[in-house]
Structures are given as C-alpha cells and as structure tokens.
Regions:
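Mixed-charge, glycine-accented linear interaction segment located at domain edges/termini
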Residues: 117-177
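The feature marks the first
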Residues: 1-60, 64
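Charged surface patches that recognize polyanionic ligands
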Residues: 43-46, 51-97
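Short, structured motif recognition centered on aromatic/hydrophobic residues
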Residues: 25-30, 50, 54, 109-113, ...
Length: 188
C-alpha cells in the first residue's frame, strides 16, 4: 500500500485556523496549491509551537547570515492573510510529529507533519516519523521566509483568539463562567 504524502512545494496559502466556539475549537493546518487544498487536524499547543519555532528558526538563520535570500524581521504586509479556512474542512489525518528544516541553497523553510497512528494514540506517544514499521501519511509544505513569518503571526493570533483568562486564577473562562479555585469555588 502506498502511503500518501501531501506535498505543497510552492503553496498559494499555508495557514492555521479553527472551527468551533472558544473552548471547543478544533485546530487545523491548511495548505493550498493550484486549486488543491490539504487540511490536517492538530492540537492548539502544536499550532503555537510550530509558529514559535518557525520564528526562532528564521531568526537564527537571519542572525547567522546563512541564507541566500533576505529574511524579513516580521510578516510582510502583502502576505497577511486573515481569511478563514477553505470550506469544507476535511482533515486528511491527525498530526502527531512535526519537523522544521531550512534549505540553505534555496532559502526555503520546510514543514513536515506526520500522522498520529492508532498505535501512537494507544501508547501515548507521537511516534517516530523515521520508523518504517508504521505507514504514516504526511504533509510537506515548502515556504518562503515571508510566508513562514506570516504563518507564525497568524498562528499566534489564532491561538490567542480563544477564551479569556480568569483575572484571579488564570484558568480559561467558559462563556457560562467557571468555578474559580482562588475564589474558593465561587463561580466567576
């Protein structure tokens, strides 16, 4: 059986987005190239870490002067994308492990997302993408530095668009309030 690898070597769009109300959101990555849209599901923390690591990698490459192309300090105005996810959102798989890389020759950032298999879910691990004993679907997206900066900006915006924090205990507030431990269980 051939395991699909969803590749977007020069995407028109690569974004993080959500479906659902705050507190019940499902997080997605979505890549689009030449009319083909690939969506994968992942955890909020994975979106947050991916955006942070992209920025860190670009900052490191920029500081070392290890790029053949200019790396912007922040997102470029012409690349800002606040549009929603392309609908319908049909996830190809749930993301377990992710990896980032920098292609020094081409000056491009490479993102790879590997499927969380049933065996991984049962063992409580995210699996090893190099383990050939398990067939894993994957998503591979190649981004310019500008596209990566925009992804990181939007990822931060999406992650922080959820529920606000309780001013007393810093736990997320549900629309109906919550039982605040610092206020001895009094609903806030």
């Amino acid at each position: 059986m051939v395991v699909p690898i969803f590749e977007h070597p020069s995407p028109d769009r690569f974004i993080a987005g959500t479906v659902g109300l705050p507190g019940e959101r499902t997080f997605f990555l979505q890549a689009a190239s030449e009319g083909v849209v690939t969506s994968v599901t992942l955890e909020k923390e994975q979106v947050e870490m991916l955006g942070e690591r992209m920025d860190e990698l670009l900052d490191m490459v920029r500081a070392k002067g290890a790029s053949t192309v200019p790396i912007p300090v922040g997102p470029l105005e012409e690349l800002i994308d606040n549009a929603g996810l392309a609908m319908p959102v049909d996830a190809e798989f749930i993301v377990g492990t992710m990896s980032l890389g920098w292609d020094t020759q081409a000056g491009l950032l490479i993102v790879e997302c590997f499927e969380l298999t049933q065996q991984d879910a049962e063992s409580g691990t995210s699996g090893d993408p190099d383990d050939d004993s398990q067939e894993r679907r994957s998503l591979k997206v190649t981004l310019t530095a500008g596209q990566a900066r925009e992804f990181a900006r939007r990822a931060d915006q999406v992650v922080n668009a959820g529920r606000s924090d309780c001013p007393f205990c810093a736990l997320p507030l549900d629309p109906a309030g919550h039982m605040c431990p610092r206020a001895n269980g009094i609903a806030r």
